[in-house]
Amino acid sequence: MNQVDLDSTHRKGLWAILAIAVVASASAFTMPLPAAANADPAPLPPSTATAAPSPAQEIITPLPGAPVSSEAQPGDPNAPSLDPNAPYPLAVDPNAGRITNAVGGFSFVLPAGWVESEASHLDYGSVLLSKAIEQPPVLGQPTVVATDTRIVLGRLDQKLYASAEADNIKAAVRLGSDMGEFYLPYPGTRINQETIPLHANGIAGSASYYEVKFSDPNKPIGQICTSVVGSPAASTPDVGPSQRWFVVWLGTSNNPVDKGAAKELAESIRSEMAPIPASVSAPAPVG
């Protein structure tokens, strides 16, 4: 006859009851899950931290028929970001490269690619400019310049017949004719003549351009552009020297005159002469 261990039976029954209770509690916990899955989640407690607002994006609707630009538009997430530390672009100084000629009493802006040369040997004018073609091989030596083009500037004084013309248009044409004979003393035919109005810095003027087709076919076509700016001297003797200046730009078909640059050069001329003081009249007699 087998003897029953009451303690063992009691323990087994206790574990069975606990197992059934665990299973029952698990069933009681897990069964409502499918129903709770479709329910709204419980609201989270409010946070004390303030979230950073998301950057607003501007939505731009193009007009019908408007061309589509390939550049990045405002609000484009692919647009490059601006560097707050980037330097602001510097404004271009219109007087950069300005040169003052004390002998002629004027200043001008040096054209790009040109250098000032020795002018003491000039028969007319007080400034000689040469076109640079390469830098000097040795530091300190003069720049290598072209030999078939040059620019001469100076005061339109009585050395030049053109100074007798009070009208700047006529003075520029006369100057071009005289300088053409002086610098291009070869037989030929003048072609492609032009008159170019000038006005800048309150100084009116005119330019005359033409080309010379030489009789010698081996010579390249010559080109000359002469400009006159300023006002002719008054008839009174105390007004000082002439307030007119000239520019002569010489070139060839191999190294042509830049008419746009010639216009800018002439229009950059400014008077650097001291104003003539007004004469002081004697006081009227009292009586």
UniProtKB/Swiss-Prot annotation:
GO terms for cellular component: extracellular region. Residues 40-56 have a biased composition (Low complexity). This is Alanine and proline-rich secreted protein Apa. Its main location: secreted. One of its GO terms (molecular function) is extracellular matrix binding. The keyword Signal applies. Belongs to the Apa family. Residues 76-96 are annotated as: 3 X 4 AA repeats of D-P-N-A. Residues 1-39 form the signal peptide. Keywords: Repeat, Secreted, Signal. It holds the Pfam family FAP. Sequence repeats lie at residues 76-79, 83-86, 93-96. The keyword GTP-binding does not apply. The gene is apa. It comes from the Bacteria. Residues 40-88 are annotated as: Disordered. It is found in: Secreted.
